């Protein structure tokens, strides 16, 4: 999911171990040059209307997120109860990376990594498209897939191809 979809999640969007994406946040500049963040009651594209499933290993975080703020309309709010914007997510992630002493990652890099993990594990294309909110798997393959294999893993893959296995080579 995108950070704009995350910023627009409401408690009613949760289902058992999944959540429905039905809206997104948009950002634009006002006449005085300040950014305005608004939730639109529709996603960026038709493919954005979807249900995203949560892997079993992450069920624990679902309950933690849901119970952390049960009385507000939006799931992710700041200390004052105000809905967190996409910029809040980006800044928080940056602070966490700094605290951990790791290279800064953007929410979009995390999304790209998730898409790559799904593709690398040969997940069904329809499921990938649903999780990512894409109408065409080529979008995920072209813009989100990064080769995460080590050189040794690449050597093993290429060496396993019968035509390249070296049978008969000197």
Q: PLM features: residue spans?
A:
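Short, cationic motifs built from Arg/Lys/His that form the positively charged side of catalytic pockets
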Residues: 1-4, 50-52, 62-66, 111
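C-terminal catalytic core of tyrosine-transesterase DNA break-rejoin enzymes
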Residues: 1-5, 92-99, 109-135, 157
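Short, charged phosphate-coordinating catalytic segments
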Residues: 1-27, 126
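Catalytic-site neighborhood detector that most strongly recognizes the C-terminal catalytic loop/helix
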Residues: 25, 132-157
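C-terminal secondary-structure termini that scaffold catalytic or DNA-interacting sites
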Residues: 27-49, 56-58, 80, 158-170
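Active-site/catalytic core of tyrosine-dependent DNA strand-transfer enzymes
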Residues: 53-102
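Catalytic tyrosine of NAD(P)H-dependent dehydrogenase/reductases that use a Tyr as the general acid/base
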Residues: 107-108, 144
């Amino acid at each position: 999911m995108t950070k704009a979809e995350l910023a627009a999640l409401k408690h009613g969007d949760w289902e058992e171990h999944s959540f429905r994406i039905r809206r997104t946040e948009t950002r634009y500049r006002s006449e005085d040059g300040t950014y305005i963040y608004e939730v639109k009651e529709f996603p960026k594209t038709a493919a954005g209307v979807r249900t995203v499933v949560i892997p079993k290993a992450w069920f624990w975080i679902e309950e933690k997120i849901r119970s952390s703020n049960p009385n507000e309309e939006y799931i992710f709010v700041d200390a004052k109860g105000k809905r967190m914007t996409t910029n809040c997510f980006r800044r928080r992630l940056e602070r966490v990376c700094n605290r951990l002493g790791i290279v800064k990652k953007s929410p979009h890099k995390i999304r790209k990594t998730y898409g790559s993990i799904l593709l690398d594990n040969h997940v069904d294309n329809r499921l990938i498209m649903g999780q990512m909110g894409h109408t065409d798997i080529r979008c995920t393959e072209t813009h989100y897939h990064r080769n995460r294999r080590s050189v040794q893993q690449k050597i093993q893959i290429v060496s396993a191809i019968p035509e390249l296995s070296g049978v008969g080579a000197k």
